[in-house]
């Protein structure tokens, strides 16, 4: 890996860290507003707990999709369903934000991660 590639990967990680500050409309059991990474962590944990009940799934792919599915929210936050309007295209906005975040990465990795997000958004995988 050359220095430019390494810098791009580190830049991506730094930019996606903004996700830690994104709050969702959901709340924890204690009543505190949940962050997007907390939501993602719980989703990954649920996937692990139910993995044995879904033996036909590609578990590695499932976990990757869990991690990537809300990454675009790092730039403009979460838009809860109750705040969406007919004019607002949450999917397109999040995809564009994800593309912006991925820009620092090598092209093959960009394509791979965007394909995972598209898989999630279009419900391609079982």
Regions found by a protein language model. Give the residues of each.
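Alpha-helical, largely C-terminal catalytic domains
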Residues: 1-126
């Amino acid at each position: 890996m050359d220095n430019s590639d390494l810098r791009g990967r580190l830049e991506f990680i730094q930019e996606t860290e903004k996700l830690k500050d994104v709050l969702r409309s959901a709340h924890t059991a204690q009543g505190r507003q949940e962050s997007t990474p907390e939501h993602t962590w719980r989703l990954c944990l649920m996937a692990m707990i139910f993995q044995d009940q879904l033996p036909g799934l590609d578990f590695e792919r499932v976990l990757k999709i869990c991690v990537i599915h809300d990454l675009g929210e790092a730039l403009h936050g979460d838009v809860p369903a109750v705040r969406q309007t007919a004019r607002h295209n949450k999917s397109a906005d999040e995809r564009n934000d994800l593309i912006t975040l991925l820009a620092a990465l090598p092209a093959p990795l960009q394509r791979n991660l965007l394909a995972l997000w598209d898989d999630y958004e279009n419900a391609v995988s079982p």
